[in-house]
Regions:
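Enzymes that bind and transform nitrogen-containing heteroaromatic metabolites
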Residues: 1-315
Length: 315
């Protein structure tokens, strides 16, 4: 928890702007959009062979210092960040923003709606239920995203010592919302979450006949997840991982929910046995294989030894 604040240059932040939710509203930049779902950014770091880590449960550092700072800048620009239960168990992540106060964006979607022009101009410290702008004594920005953990069967045995809970108590992050299919989570876990400002969000588990669901891993359907997030007043969400979550979001019709893709490419190969980003291949009506998805409106941004690829899923 002694991690120092990070700084992300404004010139690089400006290059990312076309790929992010609107700064003042947190919603989709396309004013013609009538979607009631949050703005969804899919972002992750990958090796040259499209691997996230050396193996299941193995924490693998891929991002260099510049692209790591970029990730925290992206967190500051979203109302929520989302990971799967596997990542929560394997990494014990903090799921907060460590951007230095002078690198904080001037507005957030929630702050803009509640604090008006003063917040937009950065003239006041703003605190809301879902997002905050200002500075703490640590020098780390108080504008924090809400962690969302997808945990259908409550496999994540979080405790007061879990990093995300410690950061929430210290005022350096927010407590998570845990999306689960368990109708009555344990009272001790519920109290622990709620005392820190988090909670359980209970969704009905899709039936095996639900075509929107990846049957091999029994996931929730993404429309239900994103609708639940939006119902909490969160207008933008950054999906960070892990592999099952990313592959699921890229699969089939799920990719229609993605508004922006931001991928950090690290100059390394992880090799066989790694956790790869490789969603199920599509098949054309005549039975021939076809590509799952392609990016359009792409931007390439060198950051140190890494390269960041930004784009939008082609329709």
């Amino acid at each position: 928890m002694a991690d120092s604040p990070l700084v992300f240059p404004s010139v690089e932040a400006q290059r990312l702007e076309p790929h992010l939710p609107d700064l003042s509203t947190g919603t989709k930049n396309d004013v013609s959009s009538s979607s009631s779902l949050p703005f969804v950014t899919l972002t992750f770091a990958t090796s040259l062979d499209s691997a996230l880590s050396l193996g299941p449960g193995i924490r693998t550092a891929l991002s260099g210092p510049q692209s790591k700072a970029m990730t925290h800048y992206l967190r500051s620009r979203h109302d929520a960040i989302c990971v799967g239960v596997g990542t929560a168990i394997a990494d014990d992540p903090g799921l907060n923003c460590r951007l230095a106060a002078d690198s904080t964006p001037q507005a957030s979607s929630h702050a803009a709606a509640t604090a008006g022009v003063g917040a937009l101009l950065g003239l006041a410290s703003v605190s809301t239920d879902n997002a905050m702008i200002g500075e703490t004594s640590s020098g780390i920005t108080a504008r924090q995203p809400r962690p969302i953990v997808i945990d259908p069967r409550l496999r994540w045995d979080f405790t007061p010592k879990s990093k995300v809970m410690q950061l929430a108590r210290a005022g350096k992050g927010l407590a998570p919302y845990v999306i689960t299919a368990v109708p009555q989570p344990p009272e001790s876990k519920r109290k622990l979450l709620e005392d820190a400002g988090g909670k359980f969000i209970v969704l009905n588990e899709p039936k095996s006949s639900d075509t929107r669901m990846d049957l091999s891993s029994r996931r929730f359907d993404w429309h239900s997840i994103l609708n639940a997030v939006r119902n909490e007043g969160l207008q933008s969400i950054m999906v960070e991982g892990g592999g099952e979550v990313i592959n699921s979001l890229l699969s089939g019709e799920n990719s229609q929910f993605i508004d922006s893709v931001i991928i950090t490419l690290a100059p390394t190969w992880l090799g066989q046995g790694s956790v790869f980003i490789s969603p199920p291949r599509k098949t054309s009506p005549d039975g021939k294989p076809s590509a799952v998805a392609r990016l359009t409106n792409t931007t390439w941004i060198p950051l140190g030894e890494d390269v960041v690829l930004c784009g939008k899923i082609a329709s």
